[in-house]
């Protein structure tokens, strides 16, 4: 609770955890004293933009407190009083630091105490020479420029010593750090890293790190104070070894209340019907909460019976609002009622700041009377000619298609074919972005099949395959003699999947066997099955690798059947993984006393959702549309890492009968967006709809969406705007995120980037002790029971609301008030 002498009162609830602060308004209330003149807001609370001073380590630094009539001047750093020492000298209004170091970075303040009042100036000091997170521009001038002119064997040597001169790196927390050790040798040397003299492993650091062997670099993102230390790169081959050591110092950021740029927002004038915008630049290390407030009148008065002003919150940060969006207030189609006082209010865990501006509305100038002119016959003629040409083109296309259709041979009416040889060159289908890495040109034939068709009509198309040829891809080809096939894992769209052991498929462990999954064709596979499997393999090559998708590890394409080697997920698909971990009483089986394999917490479910959002964000960045995102298509590894699968499958979206069940009994329509369901339009936003259903599956521990709802009834309910109820043990914020994913208009749904940001924030603020209270029966989520617990549902086995208002689906019992949620 913060109060001012002028009578302005704001109450904020601030949550701070792990360096992240989140400010939310407890009450959208601003109280100003009636004696305060609106034209002259109290300047004592308007903090001007602080002076920024930067210095390199070892340089002198001087700050001057330019405040007049000071009886006494005191200095503080990050709120702690400063005094003279062997490095710091205070003389009058000057503060001098002899040799600056990274620990001198922070927020400095000088306070001048006068006879009747006091004043304060702020300085931001930054003593660092840090790498930026995008500091990869020098990756292209690495050791690749050095090529051995001869085959002479030699020990490793440094190729760019100028990039290694800086040994001390002092960076602020949350920055990205990159250390480079460009080297060369013959044979090509290997590189490994030590931290403080010990082997540096991924598990030694939260978030891990990246090693780019081709650029001889180590990259650590979002560094924290625990990352301080000495980092040594060791480059060696059989002829020698060299090493180089860097020292990393991480400087913690200095906390302070939000600082608003002076002069913003500025007073503005606009004519009736025009547009106007107010800009409020906020500087805050901790996450700020920003609101735009307008002083309004009620019944001709600006103040109520209790003497408090009437206020209206125009704009506040929501679940999917970024700081850049909230810093600007747009007013469209201005009217005289929009004139008045507007306030930008910013607060964080340290304090609150605000600036005020005025909007003046002017009457619109009278328009001169326009006299009608003669029609532009030339423009009319151009339009008519254009329409005629378009009609001719459409007619030509229709006639060509009809002609091609009549020429197609009817093989069913031909006599039996005893022998036919054909070659089918399948071209690469580029469905991802142009910058995606690929090992072959897009015009390279993927596979050439030579087949012999049997005269028996019932024989499979490839039952008599004599050969098929695939060009060898050295980047992905894996030796067959190092692959040992194991037990079957199941049957997929193109054939079967088996477990296998691959020796040396991990380049960092060339002699160790790694458990993998191998996709292969069945004996009765068709040409389409083969082409689909090849297409899936090529799609996975182009998309690249990510932690939260099933990655391609290699392929066996030569001298034998086609094997596609992918990552192995030992814990199966997410749907069964969640069901196996339900508390007793939620099982489908009769054994209600069975103890679940692991005890799930609320944070576990949020983490699962966050990982899948990151995987979908990566696929969206590669221009890949999944089209079948569901818990059954997510696999779980031994370390509980979520991996999205089947994103490279070829799907015939034009020949799907959505009114029939699939072979495993699940209806794909329950995960499909309305535009995909009714119009066969698949976009990244239709994947967002499916992600909302996937969230519902996660927070019901593998529940079936829309249990017991017939498909025909489901179509009707979706068109009427009905949506599923909030699952138990799901917060209102997460449920509102699901509802945002289920917006009827695709453009109103959040992007995966926004979902990642929101889930990252929720995950950071979630404790580990929030265990799920799911011991009750599962009738709300099980297709075997009617829904009797939902507060807004009726009928057997329904998850919808009874008697919804037109275009207004049933929501949980809370309402939106000026961008906030009232419960």
From Swiss-Prot:
Residues 483-772 form the Protein kinase domain. It is a single-pass type I membrane protein. Residues 401-823 are cytoplasmic. ATP binds at residues 489-497, 519, 567-569, 573. Its main location: membrane. GO terms for cellular component: cytoplasmic vesicle; Golgi apparatus; plasma membrane; receptor complex. It comes from the Eukaryota. Residues 24-379 are extracellular. Autophosphorylated. Binding of FGF family members together with heparan sulfate proteoglycan or heparin promotes receptor dimerization and autophosphorylation on tyrosine residues. Autophosphorylation occurs in trans between the two FGFR molecules present in the dimer. N-glycosylated in the endoplasmic reticulum. The N-glycan chains undergo further maturation to an Endo H-resistant form in the Golgi apparatus. It is an enzyme of class 2 (transferase). Residues 163-180 are annotated as: Heparin-binding. The modification Phosphotyrosine is found at residues 468, 588, 658-659, 771. Residues 27-128, 156-249, 258-360 form the Ig-like C2-type domain. Keywords: Apoptosis, ATP-binding, Cell membrane, Cytoplasmic vesicle, Disulfide bond, Glycoprotein, Golgi apparatus, Immunoglobulin domain, Kinase, Membrane, Nucleotide-binding, Phosphoprotein, Receptor, Repeat, Signal, Transferase, Transmembrane, Transmembrane helix, Tyrosine-protein kinase, Ubl conjugation. Monomer. Homodimer after ligand binding. Belongs to the protein kinase superfamily. Tyr protein kinase family. Fibroblast growth factor receptor subfamily. This is Fibroblast growth factor receptor 2. The lineage of its organism: Eukaryota, Metazoa, Chordata, Craniata, Vertebrata. The gene is FGFR2.
């Amino acid at each position: 609770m913060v109060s001012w002498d002028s009578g302005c009162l704001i109450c904020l609830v601030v949550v701070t955890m792990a360096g992240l602060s989140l400010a939310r308004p407890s009450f959208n209330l601003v109280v100003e004293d009636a004696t305060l003149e609106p034209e002259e807001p109290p300047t004592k609370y308007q903090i001007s933009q602080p002076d920024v001073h930067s210095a390199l380590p070892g340089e002198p630094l001087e700050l001057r407190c330019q405040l007049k009539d000071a009886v006494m001047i005191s200095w503080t750093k990050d709120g702690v009083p400063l005094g003279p020492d062997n490095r710091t000298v205070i003389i009058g209004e000057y503060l001098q630091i002899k040799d600056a170091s990274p620990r001198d970075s922070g927020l400095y303040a000088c306070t001048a105490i006068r006879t009747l009042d006091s004043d304060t100036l702020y300085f931001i000091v930054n003593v660092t020479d840090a790498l930026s997170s995008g500091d990869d521009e020098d990756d292209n001038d690495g050791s690749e420029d050095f090529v051995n002119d001869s085959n002479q064997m030699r020990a490793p040597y440094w190729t760019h010593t100028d990039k290694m001169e800086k040994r001390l790196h002092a960076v602020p927390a949350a920055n990205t750090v990159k250390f480079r050790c460009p080297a060369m040798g013959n044979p090509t040397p290997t590189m490994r890293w030590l931290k403080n003299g010990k082997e540096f492993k991924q598990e030694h650091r939260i978030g891990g790190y990246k090693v780019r062997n081709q650029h001889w670099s180590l990259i650590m993102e979002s560094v924290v104070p625990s990352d301080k230390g000495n980092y040594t790169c060791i480059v060696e081959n059989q002829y020698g070894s060299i090493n180089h050591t860097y020292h990393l110092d991480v400087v913690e950021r200095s906390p302070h209340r939000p600082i608003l740029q002076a002069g913003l927002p500025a007073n503005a004038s606009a004519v009736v019907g025009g547009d106007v915008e107010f800009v409020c630049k906020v500087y805050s290390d901790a996450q700020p909460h920003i609101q735009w407030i307008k002083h309004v009148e009620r019944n001709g008065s600006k103040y109520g019976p209790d003497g408090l002003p009437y206020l209206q919150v125009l704009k506040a940060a929501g679940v999917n609002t970024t700081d850049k969006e909230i810093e600007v207030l747009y007013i469209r189609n201005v009217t005289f009622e929009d004139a008045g006082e507007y306030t930008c209010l910013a607060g964080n865990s340290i304090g609150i700041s605000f600036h005020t501006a005025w909007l003046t509305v002017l009457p619109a100038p009278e328009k001169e009377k326009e006299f009608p002119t003669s029609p532009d016959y030339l423009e009319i003629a151009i339009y008519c000619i254009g329409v005629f040409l378009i009609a001719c083109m459409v007619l030509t296309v229709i006639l060509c298609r009809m002609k091609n259709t009549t020429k197609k041979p009817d093989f069913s009416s031909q006599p039996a074919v005893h022998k036919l040889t054909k070659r089918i060159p399948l071209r690469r289908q580029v469905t991802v972005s142009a910058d995606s890495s690929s090992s072959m040109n897009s015009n390279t034939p993927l596979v050439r099949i030579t087949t012999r068709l049997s005269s028996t009509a019932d024989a499979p198309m490839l039952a008599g395959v004599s050969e098929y040829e695939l060009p060898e891809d050295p980047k992905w080809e894996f030796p067959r003699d190092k692959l040992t096939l194991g037990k079957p894992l199941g049957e997929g769209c193109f054939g079967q999947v088996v477990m296998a052991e691959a020796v040396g498929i991990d380049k960092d462990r060339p002699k160790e066997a790694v458990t993998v999954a191998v996709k292969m064709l069945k004996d009765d596979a068709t040409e389409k099955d083969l082409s689909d499997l090849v297409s899936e393999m090529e799609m996975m090559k182009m998309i690249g690798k990510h932690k939260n998708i099933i990655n391609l590890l290699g392929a066996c394409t030569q001298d034998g059947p086609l094997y596609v080697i992918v990552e192995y997920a030992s814990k199966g698909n997410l749907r069964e993984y969640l069901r196996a971990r339900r508390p007793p009483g939620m099982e489908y089986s009769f054994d209600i006393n069975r103890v679940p394999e692991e005890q799930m917490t609320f944070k576990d479910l949020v983490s699962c959702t966050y990982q899948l959002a990151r995987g979908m964000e990566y696929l969206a960045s590669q221009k890949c549309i999944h089209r079948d995102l569901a818990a059954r298509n997510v696999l779980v590894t031994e370390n509980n890492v979520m991996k999205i699968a089947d994103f490279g499958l070829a799907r015939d979206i034009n020949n799907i009968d959505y009114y029939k069940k699939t072979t495993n009994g699940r209806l794909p329509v329950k995960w499909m967006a309305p535009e995909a369901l009714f119009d066969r339009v698949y976009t990244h936003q239709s994947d967002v709809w499916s992600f909302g259903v996937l969230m519902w599956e996660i927070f019901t521990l593998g529940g079936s969406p829309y249990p017991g709802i017939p498909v025909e009834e489901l179509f009707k309910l979706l068109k009427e705007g009905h949506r599923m109820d909030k699952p138990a043990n799901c917060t209102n914020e997460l449920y509102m995120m699901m509802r945002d994913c289920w917006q009827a208009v695709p453009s109103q749904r959040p992007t995966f980037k926004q979902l990642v940001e929101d889930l990252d924030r929720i995950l950071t603020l979630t404790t580990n002790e929030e265990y799920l209270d799911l011991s009750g029966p599962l009738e709300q989520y099980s297709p075997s029971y009617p829904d009797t617990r939902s507060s807004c549902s009726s009928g057997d086995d329904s998850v919808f609301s009874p008697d919804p208002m037109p275009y207004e689906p049933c929501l949980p019992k809370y309402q939106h008030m000026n961008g906030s949620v009232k419960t």
